[in-house]
């Protein structure tokens, strides 16, 4: 089976006029349970299951790989609708979209791994985000090299270091760890 045959039904069957209606319904459903996650602090797994059922976790995965092939500008409408219902879910979804929008153009990832991450998002709703912020460095947006070290071993790579957080970490399948190699 090719990756393109894994595309969720929603991305194949909903026309643009109906998409706004679908997003409004999703917003309402997410809003109905937002208080549960606000009060408990739990990861909103059911929200991501719902988004996956609608093909929205793979929205920025290229069409050739089974995703929606959407640009970040197009994904903005989905983010707005999700944020209207449940902002924490929207923040994690933003990270998913950002990672997938850059992943397939990255030559620092082996092709087989890039394809696997995309396939996992399409098929299983797998989430990805970056681990970049460190105790001493803070956010890398200010410059500097990470203290996290990646060393090649006979078995692959060994990564050691400490990250402070990653948005959505409790529900991520994939972690893109920012490190320097030695």
Residue locations for each model-derived region?
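Residue-level signal for functionally critical sites in structured catalytic/ligand-binding pockets
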Residues: 37-42, 47, 129, 133-134, ...
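Amphipathic, small/basic residue-rich leader segments at the start of a protein or domain
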Residues: 1-95
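A short core secondary-structure module
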Residues: 162-182
């Amino acid at each position: 089976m090719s990756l393109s045959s894994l595309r969720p039904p929603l991305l194949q069957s909903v026309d643009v006029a109906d998409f706004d209606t679908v997003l409004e319904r999703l917003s309402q459903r997410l809003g109905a349970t937002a208080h549960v996650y606000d009060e408990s602090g739990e990861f909103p797994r059911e929200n991501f299951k719902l988004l996956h059922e609608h093909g929205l976790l793979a929205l920025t995965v290229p069409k050739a790989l089974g995703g929606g092939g959407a640009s970040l500008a197009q994904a903005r409408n989905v983010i707005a609708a999700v944020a209207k219902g449940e902002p924490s879910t929207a923040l994690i979804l933003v990270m998913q979209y950002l990672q997938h929008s850059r992943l397939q153009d990255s030559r620092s990832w082996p092709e087989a791994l890039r394809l696997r991450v995309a396939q996992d998002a399409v098929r299983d709703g797998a989430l990805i985000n970056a681990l970049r912020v460190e105790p001493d460095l803070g956010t890398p947006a200010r410059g500097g090299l990470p203290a996290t070290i990646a060393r090649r071993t006979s078995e692959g790579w060994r990564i050691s270091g400490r990250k402070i957080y990653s948005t959505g970490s409790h529900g991520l399948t994939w972690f893109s760890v920012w490190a320097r190699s030695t």
